[in-house]
């Protein structure tokens, strides 16, 4: 945004910490899935599904169209098992094909609807405020960590060696570090 872009897309490589970080910096969190990839409704996806404002099943074309529609129905059904979003938005589930360029417009419509919903109800601005607070605290943590490690590097290395040599337990080493 600072560079003047109105739309910024952020892609992550999988399920993990990166998605949590990305969720704290975006207006709409879109989960892109593939039908038949073996991860439909797995427990590992639960956390990321709860964060999603929308789920799109891509590659809904050719022989994969029917499995994609089936996955769409499964995800729609599964979303009812999760707690509702605090902003009242009900996550949408769609299918699309980047290859055949089908239903991409519907994907943009879902993003637009979610954005409009949150803006009209004041959640857009409050989410931005919460994101700013989150990043402020992240920056504090990073700065404190950097400062602490640089000031105690030698002591940490010595205690670390004692832990590795089983002369101290990790908790004992921690107590010594903070004396």
Regions found by a protein language model. Give the residues of each.
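Conserved ATPase-coupling elements of RecA-like P-loop NTPase cores
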Residues: 15-22, 40-43, 67-68
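Inter-motif core of Ras-like GTPase G domains
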Residues: 2, 18-36, 46-56
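Canonical P-loop GTPase G-domain recognition
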Residues: 54, 60-121
């Amino acid at each position: 945004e600072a560079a003047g872009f109105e739309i910024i897309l952020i892609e992550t490589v999988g399920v993990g910490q990166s998605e949590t970080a990305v969720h704290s910096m975006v207006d709409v969190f879109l989960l892109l899935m593939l039908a038949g990839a073996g991860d439909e409704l797995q427990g590992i996806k639960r956390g990321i599904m709860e964060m999603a404002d929308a789920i799109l099943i891509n590659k809904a074309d050719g022989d994969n169209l029917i499995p994609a529609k089936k996955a769409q129905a499964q995800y729609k059904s599964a979303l009812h098992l999760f707690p509702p979003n605090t902003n009242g938005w009900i996550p949408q589930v769609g299918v699309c094909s980047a290859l055949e360029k089908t239903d991409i417009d519907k994907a943009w419509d879902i993003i637009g609807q979610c954005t409009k919903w949150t803006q009209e109800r004041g959640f857009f601005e409050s989410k931005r405020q919460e994101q700013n607070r989150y990043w402020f605290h992240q920056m504090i943590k990073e700065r404190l960590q950097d400062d602490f490690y640089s000031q105690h590097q030698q002591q940490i290395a010595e205690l670390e060696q004692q832990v590795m040599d089983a002369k101290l337990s990790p908790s004992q080493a921690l107590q010594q570090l903070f004396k």
